[in-house]
Amino acid sequence: GKIGENIVLRRSINIKGNIYSYVHNSVSEGLGKIGVLLDIDSDEGNHDEFGKNICMHIAALNPKSISDKDLPQEFIDVEKEIIKKQLKDSGKPNDILEKMMEGKLRKFLEENTLLGQKFVIDPSISIKQYIEQYKSSISINKFIRYEIGS
């Protein structure tokens, strides 16, 4: 039938595997402002709570990638330039500046990668540590985060 609305599909994905999902600010089932899909591998068991917790974390903190290996080099290079500009006028020796640069870059990577981020439900641990707490072997293959307006 015809509904008279101009509906255009902007994005689509194809994701297979053990998929978990979460919709934030849900106005009805499956409809909200932020949606997350998560694909994990595990050697055994039901990981519904784990999947939901990781999806909620992704919705809240918006990581750019799973790990620093997955970040585009251009993204890292832009941040390095920003850090260099911040440190340039500090007047400190070059060896100190290098260490400060490494520390700031490490913090940036932790804040922008899923495995490096502090777990939103328990900030005393990282997502990597949260995964390691599980008895079964779990690995995160992929995540997709959609937000209305982005």
Please annotate each region the language model reported.
Residues 1-150:
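N-terminal assembly/interaction segments in proteins that build large macromolecular machines
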